[in-house]
Amino acid sequence: MLYHPSVAPDLEWLADDRGLGIDDVITLHSEATYFAYATGFAPGFCYLGTLPEALQTPRLDTPRATVPAGAVAIADAQTAVYPCESPGGWRLIGACPEPLFNLSNAPPSLLTVGATVRFEPISETDFRALGGVMP
């Protein structure tokens, strides 16, 4: 996962709001192991928890009209990866370069209820090499 302000418009805000450095946010988010509690909202959208307390923050007051596929986001005590472009009110802190939902795959979603997930920080070079697109 790429943690970089160019793909994560709320990363700097979150660090400032929580009194943390960006590296602290990355460490806290990437060192936790998350449990997939439920799917919903959009096909392949998996609610992961529990977010470290230091990162827990409310949703945006006004949702964004468009959140790109692969956006890694947090809201309250949960984190998630948007599987497709959609509206969304979660705070964006990173991006996943690989698609998580594809109807051609069986099963179509890489994340399923009951799975455990960890986010591995990667460089911008690796993000691009894995198919990630920078804005």
Where are the language model's segments positioned?
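Glycine-rich active-site loops that engage anionic ligands at enzyme catalytic sites
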Residues: M1-P135
